[in-house]
Design a protein with these regions (language model features):
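Divalent metal-coordination and catalytic microenvironments
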Residues: 12, 31, 40, 72, ...
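Soluble or luminal CAZymes and related metallo-dependent hydrolases
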Residues: 47-50, 144, 203-207, 255, ...
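Residue-level marker for buried hydrophobic side chains located in beta-strands
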Residues: 37-39, 69, 92, 182-184, ...
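Short alpha-helical segments that sit at the start of domains
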Residues: 242-261
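C-terminal regulatory/interaction regions
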Residues: 257-327
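Metallo-beta-lactamase
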Residues: 43-46, 151, 159-247
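Active-site HxH/HxHxD metal-binding segment of metal-dependent hydrolases
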Residues: 43-49, 56-153
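Conserved beta-strand hairpin/beta-sheet module of binuclear metal-dependent hydrolase folds
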Residues: 4-58, 174-188
Length: 327
């Protein structure tokens, strides 16, 4: 069993590493303003296994948490919200567009994860996959739906601006502490993906590219990521300082363009180009830049990234759904 890992890199900020499933890992951030706040809560057991021990080392407990800030509504970032609320009666503030899927697990699975089974001809296994997935999270309450540009005052000089960064989800945001140059990103800046051999999880590629444009206009000293992301040339540490952080943003943009360009070439504007054929052709080009490991049966990445291929397939074929035509 993985033990909790803490990294206090600022007097008011501590990173808390959490683990879930066989290979899953999510980074949370404890903020110390006038009270205690956490950015994201991980999966359902993360509060007890990882957040509580980190708080105990500081003489606090889960009941002392006053606020949860979510970067988006996915299970590995908001799946522990309900547990923290049960212990502390704290409020949950979440991007408005992600609040629904955080509270409705069936909708979240169907919108984001069902396609993996469908695209790999495993639809018959989808219900079992959903049942296993639901063990990782609980529906999240939401007290406040955050809007782009809001400034959240947490006290002791900690004011966080809500920066809209759709791409991973439509509602994804970063929290920008302008005074210190800290950007808390969740999954908004995804490098080459969080699992070696996979691809970044991008459901809305055009939005993702625009989000990279926006992020590059910010004065960032410390990039606080939601996972240990792979990149082209940098170590996988999830807190990146100075020029390393800026380089990671550039590489994230570059890799997104590599994936998009490879899929555009693969479909060559042909409406109805079968997804699997296009994906295999695109991956041949992508592997020239990123060491993607492929499943011998499906020809797709063994460890995630189908979304980046599928969303770009939709983008360049003009198809409305991969499942309305032959995959």
């Amino acid at each position: 069993m993985n033990m909790h890992t803490d990294f206090r890199f600022h007097p008011q900020v501590t990173q808390i590493g959490t683990y879930w499933g066989e290979k899953g890992h999510t980074e949370l951030y404890l903020l110390e303003g006038d009270g205690l706040a956490v950015i994201d809560t991980g999966c359902v057991d993360a509060p007890e296994r990882f957040i509580a021990p980190a708080l105990k080392e500081r003489g606090s407990d889960l009941k002392d948490v006053q606020l949860i800030l979510n970067t988006h509504g996915h299970f590995d970032h908001a799946g522990g919200n309900a547990s923290v609320v049960a212990a502390s009666a704290c409020e949950v503030w979440m991007p408005a567009q992600d609040a629904v899927v955080a509270g409705d697990l069936d909708q979240q699975f169907d919108e984001f994860y069902l396609q993996d089974s469908q695209l790999t001809d495993r639809s018959h296994m989808a219900e079992a996959a959903k049942a296993d997935w639901k063990k990782l999270c609980e529906p999240s309450p939401v007290n406040r739906r955050l809007q782009a540009g809001e400034v959240l005052s947490l006290g002791r000089g900690m004011e966080l601006r809500v920066v809209p960064t759709p791409g991973h989800t439509l509602g994804s945001v970063c929290f920008y502490w302008e005074r210190e140059g800290f950007l808390f990103t969740g999954d908004s800046i995804a490098g080459g993906g969080s699992r070696p051999g996979g691809l970044p999880v991008i459901y809305h590629p055009q939005d993702y590219e625009r989000s990279m444009d926006l992020v590059e206009t910010l004065d960032i000293n410390v990039l606080c990521l939601g996972h240990h992301y792979v990149s082209l040339s940098l170590p996988s540490e999830s807190v990146k300082f100075g020029r390393i952080g800026k380089r990671f943003i550039q590489e994230s943009r570059e890799l997104a363009r590599v994936i998009a360009g490879a899929m555009e070439s693969a479909v060559d504007g042909r409406l109805g180009s079968p997804f699997l054929d296009a994906a295999v052709a695109a991956l041949t080009k992508i592997q020239e830049r990123l060491p993607v490991v492929l499943n011998s049966e499906t020809g797709l990445p063994v460890d995630g990234g189908t979304s980046a291929l599928y969303s770009n397939w939709l983008r360049y074929t003009g198809a409305s759904s991969a499942f309305a035509t032959r995959i």
